[in-house]
Amino acid sequence: REPNLTDRTVAALWAPTGGIVCPFNLAIAAGENAIMNGVEFQFETEASSIEKAKDGYIIHTNKGDMETKAIVNAAGLYADVFHNMVSENKIHITARKGEYLFFDKSVGTIFNTTVVPLPGKMGKGIAASYTINGNFFIGPTATDVEDKEGLNTTAEILDKLKEMAASDGYLTRFPLPLNKVITSFAGARAHEDHHEFIVQELEDAPNFFDAAGIESPGLTSSPAIGERLAKIISEKMHLEKKETFNPKRAGFVRFNEISDEEREKLIEENPLYGNVI
């Protein structure tokens, strides 16, 4: 199934139900679907502190105070900050930076599936996969950093990644073509000190619900985390199911994948489609 795997491979676990998704489009789609169903987003609003109140919480922000009966803490790298504002049972989250190398589409099909090595203490390891647009990539690395906003790539780490990619026998049985690398980027996942996904109501802070320490495989876990939290919250607060909930969100037009006739029709309906980006 994977003829290009390194000759050092002795065994593999195949997950035929696995797949890939664009994480950016998934987040946008979920947000748009939430708006369709009545959610209101408060953009550019920074929560500076949380105060326990008689019937819930008061959230102090740069745009005034907000009163709420419940809080879902899904603040990623900063989930520990908000958790620790209301709970005596403190947690600590470290930013674990991961860096990637992306290759041009001309590299072609190296693997037919996502290939992940044996995991280590820092995570699942440096994997090889594709974007939904067909770009091959390898990553992420794993480096704990102090700056939670530090999403810059580093020459030292990228050099190690390139050295690994150019060698025989890491994941592939031949060196990867480094002249086909078109970009690199970094991201940070929220590593909880005890390697735990914390998905629960806080014992000493009623109606404060954590989704904290969600690192890899957090994206894969997100539907199950959402269902679990929805169940916990609805049972605790005696919520009723919204019968008019619409779970569907229309996809967007992929302009480069449609026919010339379809493009002309879209431009007639909306001239902005005629702007080349």
Descriptions of predicted regions:
Residues 1-43, 48-55, 60, 192:
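Flavin (FAD/FMN) cofactor-binding and adjacent substrate-gating region
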Residues 18-19, 275-277:
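Short, well-ordered beta-strand elements within core beta-sheets of diverse protein domains
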Residues 23, 81, 222:
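Hydrophobic (often cysteine-bearing) scaffold residues that line and stabilize catalytic clefts
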Residues 29, 123, 132-133, 149-263, ...:
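C-terminal catalytic lobe of FAD-dependent flavoproteins
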Residues 33, 81, 85, 232, ...:
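Active-site catalytic microenvironments for nucleophilic, acid-base chemistry
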Residues 42, 72, 209-211:
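Hydrophobic/aromatic beta-strand patches that form the interior of the parallel beta-sheet core
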Residues 50-154, 255-268:
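Flavin-dependent oxidoreductases
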